Amino acid sequence: MNRFKEQAMKIVFMVAACASVLAVFLICLFLFANGIPAIAKIGPLKFLLGTVWKPSNDKFGIFPMIIASIYVTGGAILVGVPIALFTSVFMARYCPKKIYRPLKSGIELMAGVPSIVYGFFGLVLMVPLIRNTFGGTGTSWLAASLLLGIMILPTIIGPTESALRSVSESYYEGSLALGATKERSIFVVMLPAAKSGILAAVVLGIGRAISETMAVIMVAGNQARMPAGLLKGLRTMTANIVTEMGYATGLHREALIATGVVLFVFILIINLSLSLLNRRSENAN
């Protein structure tokens, strides 16, 4: 009976694994089957490096959206990673038990807040603040980066804290025994030891930021042109897809799917690059 249960569970696990792989494969197949022909029709250089997006004139250049996605994601990482890192260090090494539970619950709650709620927060509070402080409309690259920096905090904090807690306590105690201060022991010994977990958390944060749509649409200005400055509006690749997919037909629709292909490849390259970097650093150590 036990042997039968073991075999049954193996089959269940195998089916679940195959279903997951099949789902990813079908998504990739749909994207590439519909997107690659569109890129071929438009022309790879015109599509990837074109600076004008006017579907009514058969102009499908997504270079401004690619740059906007990089700018917004980069800004979010600059805002979110330092805050998340210091928060993780505080929770793992400094936080009193009475504070830890509500703080942990609050961060987990942040992860479950819908994107549209963050978008309303940015639209009602951040955009007017930027407009009154720096001028302009307020909907801008700055607003999108700040908002995404807040949104990726729980995505980075959780894995980073776990990575810090997984480091052997002997590293910390050995550093203290050699005369290092508590802060130096954490930032010079503990953080490098947890580097692989921290890099994984940053990758998750980048994926979260670059794939975000609704919140970005609400605060970024949604302007399909080359980003002109920190206080100017822009449109990311995800925003471009969501904004126009509802009414797009023909080559226009295919070009939007092709934008999804570019976004998919973009995230894949980031993940592979950081994984390779992490592997090289581990081999060096």
Locations of regions flagged by a protein language model:
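Interhelical loop and adjacent transmembrane-helix boundary motif
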Residues: 216-263
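C-terminal transmembrane helix and the adjacent membrane-cytosol boundary/short C-terminal tail
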Residues: 161-165, 169, 176, 203, ...
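Loop-to-helix entry region at the N-terminal start of transmembrane alpha-helices
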Residues: 59-73, 131-155
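Transmembrane alpha-helices
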Residues: 159-160, 182-218
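Periplasmic/extracellular loop-to-transmembrane helix junction in inner-membrane transport proteins
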Residues: 1-7, 11, 33-76, 96-97, ...
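Amphipathic cytosolic juxtamembrane alpha-helices at the membrane-cytosol interface
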Residues: 6, 96-101, 168-169, 173-200
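Cytoplasmic-entry segments and transmembrane alpha-helices of multi-pass inner-membrane transporters
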Residues: 10, 83-122, 285
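Generic hydrophobic transmembrane alpha-helix motif, especially the helices
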Residues: 108-148
